[in-house]
Amino acid sequence: PRSKQRIIYRAFPSWFFDVQGSKPLMLEENEKINWFPGYLKHGRFAKNIEQAPDWNLSRDRFWATAMPVWKGDKGTVKVVGSYDELFELSGVRLEDYHRPWVDEIEFEIDGEHFRRIPKVLDCWFESGSMPFAQLHYPFENKEKFERNYPADFIVEYVGQVRAWFYYVHCVNTALF
C-alpha cells in the first residue's frame, strides 16, 4: 500500500448466491446463446461459469441498494418482495428507499420485532437484473416483458463477457 500501513482483513457475515448449484443450468442455457465470435461460447464464457465461486451479494457499505431483508428478534428472516409488501408490514411509505431512511423501518409479525439488516446489494446484482427491471417486471408491463424476453440481440464489449453479461446470465437463469 502507498501508506506503508498494513491492511487488516476482517470476515463479515454475508449473503451469497449459490453459483455452484446453478452452474449446470447456466451451462445448459449458454448452449442456447448464438455467440459471435463463436469461440466465446465454450471458451471465455463457459470457462468463467465453470470456475466461478459462489457470489457474495451483500456489501457492508452505506451507498447502494438496500437489501430488502429484515431479521426478527427471535431469528426469523423476512425477505420483502415489494414496496407495497413493506407498506403492508410496516405502514410506512418512503420517497427514497435508500439508507438511512429504509433502515428506520421496523415492523412486527406474530409478536416478533423485525429490523432491517444493514447490508446493501452488490452493484452487479442490479446490472444483472436489467432485462426485467427496466420494465418494472413483474409489477408492470408483464405482457411486454414476456413478448420480448429473452433478448434477440445483445451487443457488448468483449470484456463485459466476464462481468455484465455473466451477471445477467446468472440472475436471469436463476429467475426464469
Model-derived features: where do they sit?
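Structured secondary-structure scaffolds
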Residues: 1-176
